[in-house]
Amino acid sequence: MMPMILTVFLSNNEQILTEVPITPETTCRDVVEFCKEPGEGSCHLAEVWRGNERPIPFDHMMYEHLQKWGPRREEVKFFLRHEDSPTENSEQGGRQTQEQRTQRNVINVPGEKRTENGVGNPRVELTLSELQDMAARQQQQIENQQQMLVAKEQRLHFLKQQERRQQQSISENEKLQKLKERVEAQENKLKKIRAMRGQVDYSKIMNGNLSAEIERFSAMFQEKKQEVQTAILRVDQLSQQLEDLKKGKLNGFQSYNGKLTGPAAVELKRLYQELQIRNQLNQEQNSKLQQQKELLNKRNMEVAMMDKRISELRERLYGKKIQLNRVNGTSSPQSPLSTSGRVAAVGPYIQVPSAGSFPVLGDPIKPQSLSIASNAAHGRSKSANDGNWPTLKQNSSSSVKPVQVAGADWKDPSVEGSVKQGTVSSQPVPFSALGPTEKPGIEIGKVPPPIPGVGKQLPPSYGTYPSPTPLGPGSTSSLERRKEGSLPRPSAGLPSRQRPTLLPATGSTPQPGSSQQIQQRISVPPSPTYPPAGPPAFPAGDSKPELPLTVAIRPFLADKGSRPQSPRKGPQTVNSSSIYSMYLQQATPPKNYQPAAHSALNKSVKAVYGKPVLPSGSTSPSPLPFLHGSLSTGTPQPQPPSESTEKEPEQDGPAAPADGSTVESLPRPLSPTKLTPIVHSPLRYQSDADLEALRRKLANAPRPLKKRSSITEPEGPGGPNIQKLLYQRFNTLAGGMEGTPFYQPSPSQDFMGTLADVDNGNTNANGNLEELPPAQPTAPLPAEPAPSSDANDNELPSPEPEELICPQTTHQTAEPAEDNNNNVATVPTTEQIPSPVAEAPSPGEEQVPPAPLPPASHPPATSTNKRTNLKKPNSERTGHGLRVRFNPLALLLDASLEGEFDLVQRIIYEVEDPSKPNDEGITPLHNAVCAGHHHIVKFLLDFGVNVNAADSDGWTPLHCAASCNSVHLCKQLVESGAAIFASTISDIETAADKCEEMEEGYIQCSQFLYGVQEKLGVMNKGVAYALWDYEAQNSDELSFHEGDALTILRRKDESETEWWWARLGDREGYVPKNLLGLYPRIKPRQRTLA
């Protein structure tokens, strides 16, 4: 039986109570003893019902008493009274007399109360007021104790809750620690899996190479086995014949005195000797085979690693072709063999030779009237892209066809196209045909090939040039026709700019240039002013299909009544150090000087930064423009100015070939982002006699066409850049020679405006300015006038291309036409050819403009004019206030690469758009990141440049930072709004995939970038920021604008992995993850000079 619970109130205010369990044996006395305090006096239990109070006797059974109340038991309240029961008082009073009761009431009642209240001696008599005061004090003490008790209960409750929380937190910490350990274990497993994956790929490559080698050796062994079997059969036959001879049965001959005679003995001796030779040869071949096998096993590890790297670069280069065409807007289909491979701005550039890709060309045929001793004196140099350009005979109707490789998969159309020409000019001597000591310093095989420019529709065969068609003065220029053609223009964000290559004129050969290349980070697409009318042959067969020859000199063919073709018909390539003119060339001599020009000898000259080495640094080659033979017949022939400050007769006979052994060849570093130091060349310090002899040979050599927007080349038609001369004067590494400064005359109304660059707004046509010394003393460099002219229009009425323009040339009838890609003027109809001017005494002082030469049709030997910087009598001053001014974007690109922080801070306010790329999509931020200049990167990012600018292959600055394993730069770019999921075009790899595994910092950089990829859309409560605007294409997609904060609800699902489900405001839908970033993009700063 369950006991009842009796609630007993210990005071009248019903705040203090206790609960007593009641059993059938429980009496009222038990309840009182349970409830009263220890040591307390007499107490009794009273029940109150509806305001009536009745004491309960001590011997009363409480269980039965409660059952008597029944359902009304809840109305009854039991109180513990701290006094004797009234029933006992009444019984005691009945036995006493009335007096005794009166006396008791007077005396004893206070005593009882005193005893009840704990007052000690009952003999002490207290008045009623004292008793009331005492009761009030005790009541106050009771209330204080009750409050203390409540506070202690609350404290106990709080401690219990805290204890429960601590236990709960301890358990959660244990769970979290277990989860962390599990995550670390999984990360370690993931790292092991990635490492194993790399090992598996490496093993696959090794196994493939080994299996191929084993198959090759097995085939060789089978051949040797067959040869041995054939030899054994032959031995058996010979042995049988010998036995027959011994027995005397062969041809009826009998042995005479034991000796064999007659033709049989001679045949037997010959066969025996042949057998001995064959056995010896077989043994030698077996020993060589064994040695080769041992060498192969010895080098397998090295070859495997090299093959892996080569395959990666090959895939990267193969993937660049599509982007190259896209950047240049070329829509004609090209085979994989026909496009120039280009390495991105980051990562080493390695070319691997492979046979059978291009036809093998024979050694160049010596021109009919040229004497090139050095070509025959040395073998072909084995550069990575070794190939020979054939030399065609002058004025011949047939050409030598190059030898084709067996099994070559395409024919060489170059010679076939050349046969159709009426008059074919002599081809330039190929660089690779020169010996190793004679190579003109251009590392042909180690230069990243440039992007082909936007040109006309390519013919079916790569690089073929159809025969030129006549073009009258009123015909439409090539660029104007090209603008109306079907080829797409390059995008505005990545304008493809063209540069003129150096072209030899009719009957001339190029002057090889400097071997001291300053490594340029950006390969520049070429665009020659004078294209070849006959197609050149292609490089020989140990170059890769994706990597054509990186230095191609195209001939200029003068055909009567014909017009040179557009220079963009074929793969025009130049040296990677496109800032500098790396070789010289001769101009087309006037009509009446053709024999002398044809007999002039090609001389390999060591040049520095595109300038020829001249005697005492006093003069430079004359800037004669190329003259088209048939188009210049009606104009007076100019007199080629003398190269010397003395009168020199023109050499009619062929000059002796120069000794090319002094020309050095500097290797190019693998990384396209680093600049190679300049090595001093002994040729620079040649004696005056050697230089004088060289100067005589170069008397009629024209000034080579320059690349545009270069620190060392002119930016317009005004000749060499003044900065180049200052740079070379103050920097001994830059050549230490003095060149001839050229000044422009005041522009005529034919020239359209004064532009600092001939790009018509397309800045930095060259990519980078190399080795810019920002602190050198220079003269003010204001803008120079530049004509806006058609780049490839070769008709006569147009300004002179990138050459010195004298006052006499400004009144010509020019027909300028604009081209946004390549503004290089073409051949002018000039009555006079401007003459060069000797170099000024110092770079900063005012120069005297050049004095023009009078028109002349007599040989240059009769010329008495000297080039001087002195003002001649009766000469007018030209070039009033004209100075050279650099392209600000070109300076910004170069300064960000070189780490010139002060120059970056100054020049960035002059740049219209600091995020504007060059022709390969390289921005200043790319250069600063690749060079590791953290302070410049931070400045550019704070300035608000486009952090997600992509180059022609889709490489963003984040890709560059990842390829350098720079965690600091990666973090800086990500926090500035870099797109973590941006991928390249060729290999579709994000920045996390570009970390260099073999270099330092790979683990930290890879972990950071992969971590950001995994945390995007998870951390920051799932908020990611839009980096571009996007308009929804389907109903389930979400439109957003740049800077919107999107909440990623689901990173991937069954149907989509590249699209995430996100919420923007009250709308939800799919968003492409590669347009999202962990941080918003920094807005461009207000353009101010403050």
From Swiss-Prot:
Its main location: cytoplasm. Gene3D superfamilies: Ankyrin repeat-containing domain, Phosphatidylinositol 3-kinase Catalytic Subunit, Chain A, domain 1. Residues 91-104, 453-478, 612-627 have a biased composition (Low complexity). Transmembrane segments: none annotated. The modification Asymmetric dimethylarginine is found at residue 554. The keyword Phosphoprotein applies. It is found in: Cytoplasm; Nucleus. It comes from the Eukaryota. Residues 382-401, 420-429, 506-522, 572-591 have a biased composition (Polar residues). It holds the Pfam family ASPP2-like_RA. In contrast to its official gene name, it is not a regulatory subunit of protein phosphatase 1. This name was given due to its similarity with a protein that binds to protein phosphatase 1. Belongs to the ASPP family. Regulator that plays a central role in regulation of apoptosis via its interaction with p53/TP53. Regulates TP53 by enhancing the DNA binding and transactivation function of TP53 on the promoters of proapoptotic genes in vivo. This is Apoptosis-stimulating of p53 protein 1. The lineage of its organism: Eukaryota, Metazoa, Chordata, Craniata, Vertebrata. The gene is PPP1R13B.
